[in-house]
UniProtKB/Swiss-Prot annotation:
One of its GO terms (cellular component) is plasma membrane. The keyword Cell membrane applies. It is found in: Cell membrane. It is a multi-pass membrane protein. Keywords: Cell membrane, Membrane, Transmembrane, Transmembrane helix. This is Uncharacterized protein AF_1327.
Length: 56
């Protein structure tokens, strides 16, 4: 498999699927909760792997 396809499948596809999923939710409240959950997960991983473990 060529590398650009692999980058697209692993990197871009999950982002766009999540973006479409959040955009199509019934209410803005559900959109905000889901986007906030993803943001808090990213912040926690940044704190763990960057601040505590020093990997970033």
């Amino acid at each position: 498999m060529p590398m650009p396809v692999l980058i697209f499948l692993i990197g871009y596809l999950p982002f766009f699927l999540a973006a479409y999923w959040i955009y199509d939710m019934e209410s803005v409240r559900k959109q905000a909760i889901t986007a906030g959950a993803i943001l808090s997960f990213d912040a926690a991983m940044l704190a763990i792997f960057g601040g505590i473990l020093g990997w970033i």
